[in-house]
Amino acid sequence: MNMKKTSILKSLSALFLASLLGAAPASAKIKVAASLTDLASIASYVGGDEVEVFSIAKANSNPHFVEVLPSYMIKVSRVAVYLKAGLALDQWADAIIEGSRNNKLDVVDCSVGVDVLDKPSGKVDASMGDVHPQGNPHYWLDPANGSIVAEHVRDALTKADPSHAALFDANAKKFKAESDKKIADWNARMAPLKGISIITYHSSWVYFAKAYGLRIVGMVEPFPGIPPTAKHLQELVDRIKAEKAKILIQEPYYGDDDPKFLERQTGIKVYRFTPSCVGTGPDDYFKHFDAMTDALSKAGG
């Protein structure tokens, strides 16, 4: 009887010890949080089956303004890596990260190494609207920058789990190879539009326009984040006609009234694209460019 009790006690002790030591088994996936779906999608590609990824901001929400919720802090408290967009786009992420109280969190600025556009040359003040002092933060809309993000993801995942370093490196290289092939396809698809004049609602599309040789000749917002006046809209009407602009790209979280006015007055065609991909799966970043370039290519040269 005593031997039986001793055996039971040993078993219970072993289970208790296992529950303590087994909280994070070696086979556990690396948990990754990202500010944007684009960063999350690339992380899913590079990490493969070894990662569990989620995004804070959704594709149809304005990435400049995300409500900081306690639920986000709780989720981030359980992750190993946080992927920030950087360039002051996702400043709201700082409050989430701080509130998570996750001292082991590896915070990665995915903008490092990007050729940043629209850096202000002088002093930035409120009269200029929501101008980012470090430059335009929408760099992921040049697909070539996706490979830079993939390298950041590879390095962060390798740091979190060195045992899978070879896998992460191979996947990052595979991402680059697939990206280069797709970029060639997208360039060919968009070639007839090279040099045409376009209008955008916000400054989200500067990198996209540069990637495909599109000329942004005006924006619905006179300054980033500043609603247009009647005078500004009339000036845009005149500019659209003078420049023969055929395309207006608008984010879906902005109102339709002003783009529809410009459409009625000039015949310009409005395309509503989310700046970020809809999903966080490994192919969603590529699918986003597939959809946008396919739609725009039908506009003609």
Predicted segment positions?
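Bacterial N-terminal signal peptides
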Residues: 11-22
